[in-house]
C-alpha cells in the first residue's frame, strides 16, 4: 500500500513516533477497500498494515496498540509488557473479524503476548477509516496534518496530544 508507506514515512520525518510511547491504531479494513465500516473486513489488508507498523516499531521504538470495533466496546489489544494494572483493566475477549475487526484480530494473533484492555490513554494515534480513536487519546487531543489523506479508500485522521492549559487568565504557559 503506497499511501500507507507514504503516511508512515511522513510521520517518521516529523518525529510523530517516540521511543517508549504507545501509539493507538484504529482501522476499518472495510473502509480501506472501499466498503462501509464493519461490513466486509480483510485479513490481507490487516496483515499489510500490521507488518508496516511492525517495521516502524522496530525503527523508532514506538509500540502500537490496536483498537477493536464497537462490538467489543472499542477495547484495545496490547502487548502484555505494556499493561499497567494501575491505569488499565484487562477484559476477557478475543478480537474476531466480526467482533473486534480484522486488524485487532490480526494483531492479537501475531503479537508476542497479547492481552485486551477496556481503555487506554495514549499520547497519539492513527485512525484509518473513521473508527473514533479519540476516546483513547490523552487530553488535549491535537490534529496532525499530513499530505496523505487516505489509506486505500479510508479517510485518515491523525492525532497527538498536549498538556492541558489550566489556571485562568493569570496563568503563564511555556
UniProtKB/Swiss-Prot annotation:
Q: What highest taxon heads this organism's lineage?
A: Bacteria
Q: What single Pfam family name could you report for this chain, choosing any that match?
A: DUF436
NCBIfam families found in the cross-reference section: TIGR01440 family protein
Q: Which HAMAP family match?
A: UPF0340
**Family stated for the protein in its record:** Belongs to the UPF0340 family.
Q: What is this protein called?
A: UPF0340 protein SAR2202
Gene source species = Staphylococcus aureus (strain MRSA252)
